[in-house]
Amino acid sequence: MPREVSWPMWAMFITATYALAGWSAYSCATSFDDPLSALFMASSGVHFVIWGNFLIVHYCLFVWAIIRVLFGQLTAIEYDHIFERLHVVLVTLASIVITMRKTYMAGHMTILFYTLCLVAHWVLRDRMDFVFQVHGTDSSLLGILCSRFMFSLLVLGMVDYKMLKFCVQNTNVDGKRHDLYLMLALSFAQLILDVLHVVLLTSLNLFEMVRSRRTRSANLVYEGGTTDDDADDEVFILEGKYIYETVFDLTITVLKVILDIIQEVFVPWSITVVYSIFVRSIKAGESFLLVYNYWKNNKKLYEKLSDVSEEQLDDTDSMCIICMDDMLPTTETTKMNRRAKMLPCGHMLHFGCLKSWMERSQTCPICRLSVFANDSNSHATTQAREQTPPDLLQERGIDEHIDVIGMQDMSVQSISLHEGTAVRRGTTGNCMNQAYDGGLLSHEERDQAGWVAFPIEFRADNKVFFNLNDSQGDRQWMASYTSYPRQNMVNSDDPDNASESHSRIPSPSLPGSLEGTSSQVDVTVSAKDAPANACFVIATSKLEQTKEVEHLKRKVEELESRVEELSKRIKTDQV
């Protein structure tokens, strides 16, 4: 029983039910000598409520006994899923019984049996996940094939087929169509589809389990029979498993929608059927888009992402955030799935882990930036050049600025993209201009300067997009800067008054801890001294802080995932 309802409470409720039923039977029998009159009294008033409760309690006990025989002790998750879905089914079946009151009693009994089968199918789906998650690859193939789960799967499949055949035979009797049996036939057909879905998922899990055992045996032979190496513990992960599961679910959902449409055509109109068609159609559309995006974006995923060098791994945390295992350079691993790949946002993952993640989401698991941002940037660059000319921004009173942020002895430099005027303060401007003229400095020059320059890529929707490059490697981030309405504009024709008319400029939008603070500027530089390609400048000490913060974030995410896993195990073990 679920945690909220203990056995003593159930025992007290059942005892009270029997006591009230005994009192009702005694009262009706002593009130009338005629059995028909006593039966009529039992079916009216408070006696009807008592006997209705008596029948419901015994039906629930019967359902519980059948479920216990098929599946044994239920887990807390299975109980939760039953009570989450049961109220909707009861309302639907009650509406069917009320609208079809003239149907034979056999039809109503079939509805009760259908409810029992429906609950058993819910438990069957959850039990499949429980069997393969708890036992994993440690169970033998013969043990799973001879388990109670496979027995329940076989029994429910046979029962669904027999009930479908029975309902089809009673749909048209003596030339008269019975809509209730037609509806039940379509409902049992959907239960057969559920059994087929479980069979497909079970076959997929069994295939993965067999391949995993073979991979482990091959690793043991290759490593000389030891069990201490990481390669010995490596399990086979079926590539594209989630996509296969999504395709199975999409196929079953489409077939169920077709059955619902048939039911809506031949059976009197029902709002529950329309709701089912609507919800399942949305679910099928989402599954189709997921499969399509995965097929479109992942065809050349390996070539699109750059390899990670040993220097880059040394400069950052080399732990994969998905599998929590250390990443190795490309030269030290022969397996493609174990190679480290760098995303456009600069985060690094195992290629195999990335493919598994991409089956569920097309974004980075750490910063949620799109993995294919570079492909969209090239299109956005062309579109921005065509749609946001400088004259249009001038008319709307929009001014785009970039703050060059320095640390300690570094100064702040503000550049107006459209006015052609640059303003600076301090004694390090020559070093900055050298970086602007030559793009990014070399690693040695950047180490001496103590800062990193970031060139602007493009503009779109009043935003400036640019890449942030690590001074110690090729790691990159994508950042954006949003333009704001012009306050005190710097007049490019009169640069002498620039320092008097400038205002404090908002900081660019940087990811995480890279966001800096701007300050006011004092010295004006003419337009000819302004750099051709504007850049952001930030101290390398900021990047070191970012690495520490990212490392702490990964540790926190690891702890959260472990806590969530332990919570699921505790919830599964509780009854």
From Swiss-Prot:
Q: Where are the transmembrane segments?
A: 5-25, 47-67, 80-100, 104-124, 139-159, 180-200
Presence of keyword Amino-acid biosynthesis:
no
Kindly report every residue range on the membrane side named Cytoplasmic: 1-4, 68-79, 125-138, 201-575
From which residue to which do the RING-type zinc fingers run? Answer: 320-368
Q: Name one GO cellular component term.
A: endoplasmic reticulum membrane
What are the protein's UniProt keywords?
A: Endoplasmic reticulum, Membrane, Metal-binding, Transferase, Transmembrane, Transmembrane helix, Ubl conjugation pathway, Zinc, Zinc-finger
Q: For side Lumenal, which residue ranges?
A: 26-46, 101-103, 160-179
Membrane topology recorded in Swiss-Prot or TrEMBL: Multi-pass membrane protein
CDD domains to which the protein is assigned, alphabetical: RING-H2_synoviolin
Q: What is its EC number?
A: 2.3.2.27
Q: What class of enzyme is it?
A: transferase
Gene Ontology MF annotations: ubiquitin protein ligase activity; zinc ion binding
Summarize the subunit comment.
Answer: Interacts with HRD3.
Function of the protein = E3 ubiquitin-protein ligase which accepts ubiquitin specifically from endoplasmic reticulum-associated E2 ligases, and transfers it to substrates promoting their degradation. Mediates the degradation of endoplasmic reticulum proteins (ERQC), also called ER-associated degradation (ERAD). Component of the HRD1 ubiquitin ligase complex, which is part of the ERAD-L and ERAD-M pathways responsible for the rapid degradation of soluble lumenal and membrane proteins with misfolded lumenal domains (ERAD-L), or ER-membrane proteins with misfolded transmembrane domains (ERAD-M).
Report the protein name in the record. ERAD-associated E3 ubiquitin-protein ligase HRD1
Q: Which organism is it from?
A: Eremothecium gossypii (strain ATCC 10895 / CBS 109.51 / FGSC 9923 / NRRL Y-1056) (Yeast)
Q: What lineage is on file?
A: Eukaryota, Fungi, Dikarya, Ascomycota, Saccharomycotina
